[in-house]
Amino acid sequence: MSFAKFSYDETTHNQVVNHPRAHENTLRGIEYLQKQGIFTSVNMVISQANFDHLYQTGVFVSNLGVESFSTAQAIPSQAGGKSHLQQALTPEQIPEYLEALHHIREDTGMFVKLTNPVPFCSVWESRPHLRYLLETSTCTAGRTIIQIDPSGQVKPCPMINNGYGNILEEGLDVVWQRMTPWSDNAYVPETCQPCDLVERCRGGCRAEAERTCGSLAAKNPFSIKPVKLSPIQEPNHNLPIGTKMVVTRNLRARKEQADLYVLFTKDRYMVTRENVARFISAIHTKGSLTIDEKLAQDRGAIETLALAYNAGILRKAA
C-alpha cells in the first residue's frame, strides 16, 4: 500500500494536507500495516512548499522501515489558477530534485522512482548518473493506462481533463479507439521529434505541458534540446569494485514465453532473457555477489547488474 507523505516535518505535512493530525495518522497507518506484514511504500509530491524537504523526508520514511519511495513534481490543476502555477517547480530546480532522490537511494538503499515523467533531455547529457531515474517514468496516458471514474467516463490519465466516452455505455473497444492519438504520439511536440530518446521519453508529461504552456502538444517546460546518442555509450552506473549485491527480498520469476522472463517483487519488475534470470537466481542461491577486479572488466555483466539494480531487483548490501 502506498502512502502520501509531503514532508518529514509534521507542521508542513499537516498544512499541505489541510488536516491537523494528518502526519500522526499517516505514521499510525504505516506502522499498523507493517505489523500486519503488508508492504508499504511512500509517494511524495514535490512543490515549492516542500522542495527543500525531499532528502530529509526520504531518510525519514526509510527509518520507518519503508522500502520503496517515489516522487512526482506537482502538476498545476486548471482549477487552481495562478496559485497552483506558482507551486510548480522551475527548470533550474529539476536537476537538484533528481539529485536529491538519487542521494536518497545511495544513502538509504531504498528503491526510488518517479511517478510523473521528467523530459529525458533535462539532465541526460549534463548528469548521466541520473539517467536511470528518468527511465523509471514515461507518459503512458492512453497507451497502457486509462482512468475510469465511478460513472464510467474514461480519460487517458487522471491529470488530463479530455473525456473519450463512457465505458459502460459504449464498451472498451469504442472508447479505446478514440484515444488512438495518444498511442500514435500525436501530442509529442515537434521540437522533440529529432531526439533519439523520443520513443522512450515522449516529451515528458503532457498534462504539465498543457497547464504551463497551453497545449497538450506544447514543449514541456523542463525540455532542453533533442539528444543525439553516441554509437558507443559510456558506462552509466555506480557499482565500483568492492560493491556487494544481494537480491531483493521475496523476488519471484514468471516465464512469459521462450527465453523471456519477468522478475518481480512488490512494486517493481524487470523483463529479461533466461540467461539473465539464471544469473540473478545464482546470486540469490549464493547469497550475494561482490564486484571484484575481474568482474568489473566484464562490461556486459556490469551493465546487467546495473539494470537489475536500477529496477530494484538487486540492491547493495549494507
Where would I find each of the regions flagged by the language model?
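Short alpha-helical segments that sit at the start of domains
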Residues: 249-277
